[in-house]
Amino acid sequence: MITLQNLPWILLYTGFLAIFLSRLFSNGKQSRDEKANGCQPPARYPQWDPIMGLDLVYSQVSALKNNRYLEWLRDLHAKMPKTFSLNFFGQRWIYSIEPEILKAVYATNFRDFGVEPIRRHSKGSMPFADKGVNTTDGEDWEFSRLLIKPFFERNVYTDTDRIKVHADHFLSLIPADGETFDAQPLVQRWFLDLTTEFIFGESMGSLAHPERADIAWTMLDVLRGGRLRAQMHRFMWARDWTWWLKAVYKVHDYVNPYIRSTLKELAEREERIKQGLPVGPERTDLVWSMATHLRDEELLRSQLCLIIVPNNDTTSIFISNCLWHLARHPEVWKKLREEVFALGEETPLTFEILRNMKYLNGVLNETHRVIPNNVTQVRACVQDTVLPVGGGPDGKWPVQVRKGDIVSVTKTVMYRDPDYWGSDADEFRPERFDGLRGTWNFLPFGGGPRRCPAQMMSQTEAAYMLCRLARTYSRIEARDPEPYTAVMRIGPSNKTGVKIALYK
């Protein structure tokens, strides 16, 4: 008998039954399609909840909460072949560490995959942001790429003079020889000053005024909450997000005045031109460039927030991760200094010089490999397609992927796979990149049309900072005996920071 008391349970069981029958029908059709296309299914991850996959949902959220997400990913892959499928929130996910699958997702099958169903349709980023270069596909994505065109311009990413003034200030704040300090927040403030100048046309000045850096820590809360909301997906309603919403509105309060003043100045400039009156030189900062194409305040804020918040985290954490490893490998620091001093002490650190320093770039690449900012590459299948490998008992057969399936390439596991990197894959050894040609098993900034537009800028900024430190300090020491514990934001950062000491 149906009563008000048992109605919710009846609806719940009915929902599960509907999902089960739908999956049963879908699996039967997929099996027929696989045979017709010469495909075979990938190995199946064993789950005690094969219908909704709530066992993996719970374990993943728990891993994120306890700062064990990287270990969770490694454990997930440890006893499985390079490609396998599982069920997550009732959806088929294909996990892989196959370079050929990454190539298909990034390039050869690019139009068969997208990010919008995962990042935008889930509403996990709302009300922080909606449309942007990180959340859209198709024409919307192409428009967002147009808005951030300055990232691609050579005169911007090759300009090391814009880095120098902030690097000088950064170096002046490093404590005296042998004094322990946490480099991570200092690097964060340096990068905040550098990036706000590029985006807004004026630096925040957080190196001189540390209290201004509070917005950076707020941005980190936005990133942490955003990742957790994405993982919880359909169960976002089960958690109180008040703390996250406070962070979101604080970031909005920070960027809104810049947007409004820019739109006002742009309108006034256009009116003066219309009247034949003289105008000054046009601004060259990013928000000005974006505003010339997009005049809606809310839409512009969405696009801008999806640039400034993730961008503020990635490069600074990358440099911090470099320093964490260099402090534990004095022989690498010594070789880096030898390469830097071979240039001559007064040689300007230009873009061309930095990009041709083999060992320096080996250090950067090895840091990307051991602790990648982009831990996983996740794409939703937007139309039925076929992946080139991953199916069958030997993993060599093509795999049928249906619209709605999710493909996740786990870079943090791929980058440590001994099959690709040798028996010392877990070791930090920059020499491994000497003479190594680019392959699909190492793409720290992605590949294909969605390659990170800030790649050259980020690499130049990191290279410049490491060179300046190597020129100034003869020795670097680790002052934290704890192992690296990854706290997930956009990418991983060490829970206890980067406690080091430097000696001139």
Curated annotation (Swiss-Prot):
One record GO biological process: ilicicolin H biosynthetic process
Enzyme class: oxidoreductase
EC number: 1.-.-.-
InterPro entries assigned to the protein according to its UniProt record, in alphabetical order: Cyt_P450, Cyt_P450_CS, Cyt_P450_E_CYP52_ascomycetes, Cyt_P450_E_CYP52_fungi, Cyt_P450_sf
Signal peptide stretch: none
SUPFAM superfamilies: Cytochrome P450
Pathway(s) where this gene product acts: Mycotoxin biosynthesis
Catalytic activity: (3E,5S)-3-[(2E,4E,8S,10E,12Z)-1-hydroxy-4,8-dimethyltetradeca-2,4,10,12-tetraen-1-ylidene]-5-[(4-hydroxyphenyl)methyl]pyrrolidine-2,4-dione + reduced [NADPH--hemoprotein reductase] + O2 = 3-[(2E,4E,8S,10E,12Z)-4,8-dimethyltetradeca-2,4,10,12-tetraenoyl]-4-hydroxy-5-(4-hydroxyphenyl)-1,2-dihydropyridin-2-one + oxidized [NADPH--hemoprotein reductase] + 2 H2O
Cytoplasm keyword on record: no
Keyword Iron on entry: yes
Keywords, comma-separated and alphabetical: Glycoprotein, Heme, Iron, Membrane, Metal-binding, Monooxygenase, Oxidoreductase, Transmembrane, Transmembrane helix
Main location group: membrane
Record's GO cellular component terms: membrane
CDD domains reported in the protein's UniProt record: CYP52
Protein name in UniProt: Cytochrome P450 monooxygenase iccC
Organism: Talaromyces variabilis (Penicillium variabile)
Species lineage: Eukaryota, Fungi, Dikarya, Ascomycota, Pezizomycotina
